[in-house]
Amino acid sequence: MPEFLGPIAGFGVTLSTMFKKPETEFYPEEKRPTAPGYHGRHQLNRYADGLEKCIGCELCAWACPADAIYVEGADNTEEERFSPGERYGQVYQINYLRCIGCGLCVEACPTRALTMTNEYEMVDDNRAGLIYEKDRLLAPLKTDMTAPPHALRPGTTQDDYYRGDITAVPEQAAPEQAAPEQPAPEREPNPETEK
């Protein structure tokens, strides 16, 4: 190509895109769907009966390269059971000022308690507001779930929870109501027996 055509070739890209319709995003009003597998805000999941999946093992905190996760485990008791195992995550914090969204914490979780949602709007005017505590990370309770602490489902073990056998809360059978006692019907006098 001759040297004097160089500037014209350079402006060729500009001229070809100058008359195209721009792809404008009206972001706050119209939100585009995220791609499948998008790494957004974390979520602590629950079992179908409402118990937490987190067992407080701290593997997610060890796997985090940015040191953004802090977990304190505590022991479950028979009076207060938050997860089906021996332990649960009493304190769970994720610092989104440090989180890089890599997902290594999700891969390290042995009970699939930690997942990443598609939620990406995590802005705050306060730095402390970007340190998410356990109450902001827990999945919301569904209508058929019971808020912990509560006992394991009757007739189940910890292994049933870990194997995924606890899928839905069984409908509570209504206790059989005894029929109200009916007063004995009054007998009509029998003329043959009353002789």
Curated annotation (Swiss-Prot):
Binds 2 [4Fe-4S] clusters per subunit. Residues 184-195 have a biased composition (Basic and acidic residues). It catalyses: a quinone + NADH + 5 H(+)(in) = a quinol + NAD(+) + 4 H(+)(out). It comes from the Bacteria. It is an enzyme of class 7 (translocase). Its cofactor is [4Fe-4S] cluster. Its main location: membrane. Residues 44-74, 90-119 form the 4Fe-4S ferredoxin-type domain. [4Fe-4S] cluster 2 binds at C64, C99, C102, C105. [4Fe-4S] cluster 1 binds at C54, C57, C60, C109. InterPro entries: 4Fe4S_Fe-S-bd, 4Fe4S_Fe_S_CS, NADH_quinone_OxRdtase_chainI. Residues 145-195 are annotated as: Disordered. One of its GO terms (molecular function) is iron ion binding. GO terms for cellular component: plasma membrane. It is a peripheral membrane protein. Belongs to the complex I 23 kDa subunit family. NDH-1 shuttles electrons from NADH, via FMN and iron-sulfur (Fe-S) centers, to quinones in the respiratory chain. The immediate electron acceptor for the enzyme in this species is believed to be ubiquinone. Couples the redox reaction to proton translocation (for every two electrons transferred, four hydrogen ions are translocated across the cytoplasmic membrane), and thus conserves the redox energy in a proton gradient. This is NADH-quinone oxidoreductase subunit I.
